[in-house]
Regions:
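Sec-dependent N-terminal signal peptides
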Residues: 4-13
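Compositionally biased alpha-helical segments
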Residues: 16-101, 105-108, 161
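A domain-start/cap signature at the N-terminus of enzymes
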Residues: 76-129, 207, 217, 265-268, ...
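Gly/Ser-rich "nucleophile elbow"/oxyanion-hole loop immediately N-terminal to the catalytic nucleophile
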Residues: 118-125, 173-209
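Active-site machinery of serine-nucleophile hydrolases
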Residues: 129, 133-187
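Short, proline-enriched alpha-helix->beta-strand connector loops that line the catalytic pocket
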Residues: 161-163, 243-248
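Primarily recognizes the serine-hydrolase "nucleophile elbow" in alpha/beta-hydrolase
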Residues: 194, 200-244
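C-terminal catalytic histidine-bearing segment of alpha/beta-hydrolase fold enzymes
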Residues: 231, 247-251, 257, 261-309
Length: 309
């Protein structure tokens, strides 16, 4: 019980942005939070904080009588009125959902985006979002489909795992750091507002420089990602505790001469020491070019889309 109360206090003690949706209170009415109702069942309620869109599931009894009554009313109301249902795609963003790779720009970055036309209409909690970070020298803005990211949009795969996919363009090819990493995060936040994206199913992956970027963004925004797949990359082993609870599957070629395999090995070892349930696949005899081997593997896609926050 003490652990539960600590979680509730941590959730509610944070300062919040201007009022929107409704104000929630703890049972003793000492702490408040502005958030939206998402769902409830079996004596628990899930709410989404306005400030950063984080979701929390709390025991109903930990909230005020007024909040408990509100939740019961929500449960009795028609499902179509549930604010937890994803809304429809907004304006100009809806036009980007054509069933083909379209071009967009925002927050200092150009990017490609893919989504089927049917994703213009919200359904349930929304659809997954996959973020793919290219390697050094990569150009996702050519007429071709973005290499690496296109594996998620192939017809046979997409029919079973319908989702949004974005691939940002790194403007200077000098790593997914600084304003470039910030730009990726801001694009994701904007898409959460403008498209029916499920905030609990946002997946991050990248190859080579993008593999480094994957670890960087895990460290920068650990609560944003439902799963991550760094391929032939590396990162800072000292930062892994921040995201040790995120499901991660690391891939590397044992004979990589561009990014030594020790880069991934060090990250995996640090994650294991932090008690992460990290998965690691090392391809014997393989060099740096393992991306196709990774992204063409059906087991990888099955694993990614099984994950949720």
């Amino acid at each position: 019980m003490k652990g539960l109360l600590l979680i509730i206090l941590l959730v509610l003690v944070s300062p919040f942005a201007e009022a929107e949706m409704r104000e929630w209170k703890t049972a003793d009415e000492s702490k408040t939070l502005v958030a939206e109702y998402v769902s409830s069942r079996d004596g628990k309620v899930t709410i989404r904080r306005k400030r950063d869109r984080r979701t929390f599931t709390l025991d109903l009894t930990a909230l005020s009588e007024k909040d408990q009554d509100y939740v019961r009313q929500r449960e009795d109301s028609p499902a179509g009125n549930d604010p937890g249902e994803a809304g429809d795609a907004d304006g100009e963003f809806a036009k980007l959902l054509t069933g083909d790779w379209e071009r967009a720009e925002g927050h200092g970055l150009k990017y490609r985006i893919f989504g089927a036309r049917k994703l213009r209409k919200g359904k349930g909690p929304g659809y997954p979002l996959v973020v793919y970070l290219h390697g050094r020298g990569g150009d996702v803005m050519t007429p071709e489909e973005p290499w690496g990211a296109r594996a998620f949009t192939r017809d046979d795969n997409y029919r079973r795992r319908t989702c949004f996919v974005i691939s940002p363009q790194n403007p200077d090819q000098q790593g997914w750091v600084g304003t470039k990493a910030d730009g990726v995060v801001e694009i994701v936040k904007e898409l959460l507002k403008k498209l029916p994206v499920d905030p609990d199913r946002i997946y991050l992956t990248g190859y080579s420089m993008g593999g480094y970027g994957t670890f960087q963004l895990l460290s920068q925004e650990p609560r944003m990602w439902a799963a991550a797949v760094p391929v032939a990359g590396g990162g800072n082993p000292g930062a892994v505790r921040d995201y040790r609870k995120v499901p991660i599957w690391v891939f590397h070629g044992a004979e990589d001469k561009v990014v030594p395999v020790g880069q991934s090995q060090a990250m995996v070892e640090a994650l294991k020491e932090a008690r992460s349930e990290v998965k690691y696949t090392e391809f014997a005899g393989a060099g740096h070019g393992v991306a196709d081997r990774v992204y063409d593997d059906e087991k990888l896609h099955e694993w990614i889309f099984e994950q949720g926050r």
